[in-house]
Every structure is written in C-alpha cells, then in structure tokens.
C-alpha cells in the first residue's frame, strides 16, 4: 500500500503546479524574488516609503462555493477570494503587495482547481498584486469528491503617516457608498436555505433578474475596489476612513471606521437596491432589517470624505466606472448606524 492507495496522488499535485505555473508567474513584478515551488515566497519591499507599515488580511468565500460546485463553474470564485482579502486591507489605505492561497479538496481535479486559480490570478491582476505562493491539500475522507474549500491571505503596505484608522474623521463628514456587483461573498447560507425551502434550482430563470439563471446572478464575482480607491487617494480626494461591507452588512461594518463618539445617519433611499436583494427578500420573506444585517444591499464599499468633497468624489468615482452615492453623514453617537 502507498499514499496513492490512500487517496493522495502526489504526481497529480506536481502536474497541477506545472499546469498553473505560467498563469501564476504572470502576476509577478520586480519585487518578486525567485519562482514558484519554493518553501517560501520572497518579496522585496518597494522603495519610496519613509516608514512603511505592513497590513495583512485573510478570508474565504463561504458557502458561495456550494453554488459554484453544483454548477461546475469555478472561474470566478478566485476573484471572490482575492476581493475579500484585498478590499479588507484597502480600508487602511494599504496597497496590496502579494497574495497567497490555500486550496483543500477531497480528490485533486486539475481542471477544477486550475479554474479556481485562473480566477485568483485575474483578481491579483485587478488588484495589482503578485500571487506569491499557495498550498494545495488533497484530503480524502475529509472532503467529498468534487468538493473543495479555499482561503486567501494578502499583505499590503501603507506609509505610516497615511494610515487610515478613523482618527481623521469629523462630525459632518459624509459617507460615499460605492456600488456592489451583487451579493458578493456573504449571506449565501441564507440564500441556499431560501432556494431549498422554495424547491428551486440554480438554473431557474426569473424575469425580475433579467432572465438570467439564479446561479449566474449569484456567482457574479465580488467587486474589487483597489485601483479606483488608490487612484482616488492619489488624485487629492481626502479620504478619512473606509469600510468594506461584508458579513453583517452596513450596520456592522460601517461603524468600524468611526471614532468612539461618532455614528452615521444613513439614508437608505439614496441608492437603488439591486434586483437580487429584492428577490431574496420576497422569496424568503426576509424582513428589511434582517436584509441589511446580512447583505451589502448594493453598497460594497464606503469612503468617508469632507462634506465639501462629496459631489466631487462621486463624480470622480463615476469617471472610473464605479457608481457612487452620498448615503449618510457622520453625527455624534456611539459607533452605530442611525436611520435603518
């Protein structure tokens, strides 16, 4: 008996690395030292920083994976994975430098996982960061055949003097909401339950969703905000704080960028709720408060700017292809959302 008899194919693992090598190395830049396959990845800090601060983040995609696996569509999951990590560290003002991934599966399917890595590579290109390394674990008996899980890890850098920690935010500043591309990567356990209870399938089409299949709409990849936000910072827009709207929605995530004596008065009618959220609320009989507590509701990222830069910020973001709205104002309070 050998390792392969136990369900672990080492040769398939080597072949998989060879299959993805060229794609992964397309993300490399001058700061990457060495190639794929070492015990560690080497990255030289870029020059030009007086007091560089490294910012790290890690995340996964949750049960959105169940839909991808049911439909055998894995190409966009990698974009979701990168987005969940880089958008998080972006809130501090950090530029992503490099990304690492962890893929675990019951039986290594080279094409399936290559599709996942293709998405990770695309996400890295969209974030201007290197895919520095990763780990692929074949775990028979732990995951079923065709099942896999993913986790991502990223590191970025920001000048210490430019680190956004909320201390710059003042009463009267405004919250600018950047549109999401859809459900992103949170709330899928509730979505899956609604589909199950209603006896639906991922291939069902709905007029309210533009006659796309439910699976197509739900697998829309998470928006990556890195390039427009970093360009906004360079353009002179005075961004004082940022929030990535993930699990817990606006009520949980937006107050995280505030000081202890501040809240945000929100105007939930200042943007249009995406059709997929109307569909979820109707099909699942989900109360409005629960929807906002679970989903991004069409706002995937928020920046805090001075009131006199609100309109300018919105127009600038629109010029970059991002729809944006003034969704609220900073008021005195206790780090909570008022008005929902």
Curated annotation (Swiss-Prot):
It catalyses: 2-formamido-N(1)-(5-O-phospho-beta-D-ribosyl)acetamidine + ATP = 5-amino-1-(5-phospho-beta-D-ribosyl)imidazole + ADP + phosphate + H(+). Coiled coil: none annotated. Its EC number is 6.3.3.1. Its main location: cytoplasm. InterPro entries: PurM-like_C_dom (IPR010918), PurM-like_C_sf (IPR036676), PurM-like_N (IPR016188), PurM-like_N_sf (IPR036921), PurM_cligase (IPR004733). It is found in: Cytoplasm. This is Phosphoribosylformylglycinamidine cyclo-ligase. It comes from Crocosphaera subtropica (strain ATCC 51142 / BH68).
